[in-house]
């Protein structure tokens, strides 16, 4: 089990799941959550989806210094993720990372 997991927050469910799948194939032992799109299937970012993915990833990692990094595709996804972190019960375990989404996800996973 890894000490750090990854959440991919995107405006598109397909994009989030695709990036998570790619990173997961390259690092199968890493907890990776995908939070993309809106509940109705449309484009956008969902506070609830990001929160659920983050909670699942945090529950899957353990040990001293364990936590999660959140990678986003666009500015409003970053703002939504920032809100989730601010309201989190353990914000000290979460880091938002400003990087290219695909490359950053793969680098974080491996």
Feature-to-residue mapping (PLM):
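N-terminal loops that bind phosphate or other acidic moieties
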Residues: 1-110
């Amino acid at each position: 089990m890894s000490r750090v997991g990854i959440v991919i927050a995107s405006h598109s469910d397909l994009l989030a799941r695709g990036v998570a799948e790619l990173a997961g194939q390259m690092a199968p032992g890493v907890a990776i959550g995908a939070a993309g799109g809106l509940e109705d299937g449309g484009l956008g970012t969902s506070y609830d989806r990001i929160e659920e993915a983050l909670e699942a990833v945090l529950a899957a990692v353990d040990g001293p210094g364990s936590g999660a990094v959140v990678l986003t595709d666009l500015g409003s996804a970053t703002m939504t993720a920032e809100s989730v972190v601010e309201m989190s019960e353990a914000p000290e375990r979460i880091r938002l990372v400003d990087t290219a989404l695909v490359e950053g996800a793969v680098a974080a996973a491996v």
